[in-house]
């Protein structure tokens, strides 16, 4: 199944767009890092908010339809994402920010914001391994 919600991968250095896929790990033009680009019109046409409100899962998988994966599969059993936000009024006042919130990714398995990307990489690798064995 194709990732219908993804249009390509844009290089953060040269700005060129390449097809998004497992074989494209860095920019083929300059070796830069690639950012996934989404088809927001497609997402808007098929994504509905009410099922999201009904889901009790606080992890990143709550937003499955918005992620660049093919669908539910062998997701890691670790709780990734859904980490709390804390209001930081004193720091916000000092910095001149009216409403400042701080995300506590220390609640993730390795206490890092990188856990979301790592979980996504594991899923994508599993999808490719599954295709290789079909």
Where on the chain are the PLM-derived regions?
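PLP-dependent amino-acid enzyme catalytic core
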Residues: 1-131
């Amino acid at each position: 199944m194709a990732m219908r919600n993804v249009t390509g991968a844009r290089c953060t250095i040269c700005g060129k767009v390449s097809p998004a896929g497992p074989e494209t790990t860095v920019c083929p033009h300059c070796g830069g890092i690639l950012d996934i680009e989404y088809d927001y019109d497609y997402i808007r046409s098929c994504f509905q908010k009410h099922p999201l409100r009904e889901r009790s899962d606080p992890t990143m998988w709550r937003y499955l339809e918005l992620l660049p994966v093919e669908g539910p599969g062998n997701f890691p059993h670790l709780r990734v994402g859904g980490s709390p936000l804390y209001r930081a009024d004193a720091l916000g006042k000092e910095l001149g920010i009216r409403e400042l919130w701080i995300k506590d990714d220390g609640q993730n398995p390795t206490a890092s914001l990188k856990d979301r990307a790592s979980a996504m990489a594991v899923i994508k690798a599993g999808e490719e391994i599954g295709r290789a064995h079909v």
